[in-house]
Every structure is written in structure tokens, then in C-alpha cells.
From Swiss-Prot:
Positions of transmembrane segments: 9-29, 45-65, 80-100, 150-170, 186-206, 221-241, 291-311, 334-354, 357-377
Membrane topology: Multi-pass membrane protein
InterPro entries per the UniProt record, alphabetical: C4_dicarb_transport, Na-dicarboxylate_symporter, Na-dicarboxylate_symporter_CS, Na:dicarbo_symporter_sf
Superkingdom, taxonomy of origin: Bacteria
Protein's recorded name: C4-dicarboxylate transport protein
Molecular function (Gene Ontology), one example: malate:proton symporter activity
Keyword check for Nucleus: no
GO cellular component: plasma membrane
Function noted in UniProt: Responsible for the transport of dicarboxylates such as succinate, fumarate, and malate from the periplasm across the membrane.
GO biological process: L-aspartate transmembrane transport
Subcellular location: Cell inner membrane
Amino acid sequence: MKTKKFYQHLYFQVLTAISIGVAVGYYMPDTGTAMKPLGDGFIKMIKMIITPIIFCTVVTGIAGMDDMKKVGRVGGKALLYFEAVSTLALAIGLMVINVIQPGVGMNADVTKLDTKGLATYTATAAKSHSFADFALGIIPNSVVDAFAKGEILQVLFFAILFGLALSAMGEKGKPVYRMIDDVAHAFFGVVNIIMKFAPIGAFGAMAFTIGKFGLGSLTKLGMLMGSFYLTCLLFIFVVLGTIGKLCGFNIFKFISYIKEELLIVLGTSSSESALPRLMAKLENLGCSKSVVGLVIPTGYSFNLDGTSIYLTMAAVFVAQATNTPLDLTQTLTILGVLMLTSKGAAGVTGSGFVTLAATFAAIPTIPVAGLALILGIDRFMSEARALTNLVGNGVATVVVSRWENELNATRMSQVLNKELDEAAVEADLLMMDPEPEEA
């Protein structure tokens, strides 16, 4: 088998592109800012392919199940895990921010804050309504509309119904099943083509960020940022690490396995940008297609651990900075509201801030104008949010697969311990035959 040289690996190319992007943004800020279309273009290409991949994966996963009760069982276990772990993430964020108290002493006067930049977020947040509205929003007005607008939960809902219907058809549904499975392979082939542009996208996104906000903005409100990054690391390596150990895998080896996806997320600040490739890698790791197809798409709305940590820390920080006292009842109210609002957040850049604005609107105790304090650094915290979200959903898929006895533990051990030939693993991932060894 051929062994790739270090510079041929996607993770090296993306890391190099990010470094160049930082340099361009710092030394040539105007040029860096002009690179924004490169990052936006890459994310748009990824989003273009997400809904058809989810549809095909979920349909083939469900239609391929022998027991239809399994669909409800997998979904139920996934939602139970999501609620438990994301609530734990909210609680950890709440605990750390109250211990470190980075906002104490800022004495910010909300009447003097520049709130012009909040208009877009508060307007979007104002559209958020009750749980009933959220539940009804999962049902698309039309199938075409759901695909056209890239509504993941709506596509997931339709895919589950279609998969159940296809399974009920029995042998008559087999030709359709095989066709959709072939289409899924073709779409993953498109993903492999798009991923070749990942370094360009990461370069453009990072050059724009540094060019527009400057390295100096990385140090603004640094205590909050440091606290947030520390909390995310604690959550990944302690909480998810413990969960991983209980399920038979090492979190460090798991992170090493998905390092390319993590670097793509680091460059684009969107955990959604790595979704298609993450699904393929989890199947390659030994998780069943049916579990991957149900858990990953659902997790991108119900299991955003990084966003959960951010929401509690940001809310309490604003309260501290504006000298808004919070008693135990008010703190628990914030936690309860966030348990609901955090479930509607999507894995795209900026969604966390919109969710935060919606939460503040529901909790009049904390001044909405206080969001202006963190608007400038929100972009620099989005990387940690997205990275934590990605790792959290990856771990969740392995956990649910194990609960369902749908995890090939031997395969997982071989892949994580790098006992398989690297070229063979890459070939499996790309759904291609391994290249022959050169003479």
C-alpha cells in the first residue's frame, strides 16, 4: 500500500492554510478581510450536500433494519443521552463561571453600551416562540422546501417516514433501497471532491477573522475566553473522556482519529462543515449506518455541548459585568430556560449568539443590551463551541451504537490503535479499493 507523505494529509494542509490565513489577516488586514468569500464558499458547498446525505443515510439505515421498533429505541436512547450530557455541560459552565467570576469588577453601564450590532441577532431571536412552535417547525410545509432551505430536522423527519414506508414495502421496496444507497455513495464521492477545497476555505475564513477583528481582539475580555476554553477542555477530556472509557475507547485516540475534521471546524468555526465526513468516519470506525444516520443529524440540534457551555457562561458573565445579582432561584431559572433554548441551536456559525439573545428575551432579569459586551469576542469563542460540539456528537454516536450492540468493538480498537494499514483505512473511508503497492 502507498503511504501518504505528511504534506499530503488533509490535516497538514488545513493547519498550514490556517497559519497562512492568520499571517495574511495580521499583516494585510484589508486583504484578509477580502478573503471572506473563500470561507463562505466552502461552507456553502458543504451545506449544499448535507441534506441529501442525511436523507439517503437515514432512509437506507431505517429501511435496512429488520426490527422497526429499533428506530424508536435508538431515537429514544439518543435523546436521553443528549438531554443528560447537554444538561451536564450547562451545569459545568454555570459552575466554572461562578467560581472564576470573570465579569466581576467590569461595572458596565448598559445605558452606555453600543447595541447597534445586536439588531440582527435580536431580530432573529424574536422569531423564536414556544416549544409547540419548535415542534411544529420540524414538520416541513413541503419536502422540496425542507431540502431547498437546508432544514436538517425537517429533512430528518421526512427521511424517517420515508424509511419506515420503504421498509413496510418489503421486497417491492428493495430496488428503491438499492438506488438510494447508490446515490448516497455518489454524494459521499462529491464530499471527497469538496474536501479538497478545505484548505482554501479554512485560509479564507481565518484571514477574514484576523483581518477584521485583529489579533488584539483575541485578548479582549480574555478572562472570559480563557475560562470558556478551559471549561471546554475539561468537558472533553474529563466528562467525554470518562464516557469514552466506560464505552471502551480512549478519548485522545478518538480525537486523533477525527483530527482532520477538527481542523476543518477550527478553520470554519462551524461544526456543520465536517458533518458528512464525520458520518463516514464513524461508520468506518465500526458504528452501524443506521445509528450514525439517526444520531448525528439529531445531535446537531439536540446535543451541542460546546454551545451549552457557552450559553450558561455568557449569560452569567453579562450578569456579573452589569452588576445584575442572581439568586439561586434566578440561576436555576436560567438553567431551565437554557435546557430548552439550547436544543434549537443549529451547528452553524453565529447560532449560539442568536440562541443567547432568545434566552435573554425570555429572562428579563439580565439586560439584553449586555450582549454588546461579548459581541466582539463571540467569533473567537465559536471555534471552541464548534470543536466541542463535533467531539460530543462523535462520542454520542459511539455510545448509542454500543448500547444497541451495533458497534464493532474489534474494528474500533484496530482503527483507533492504528493496527490497520493507513491506506486501507483511507480507502474504506472513501469507499474505494485500496491502491496497489508500488513495485
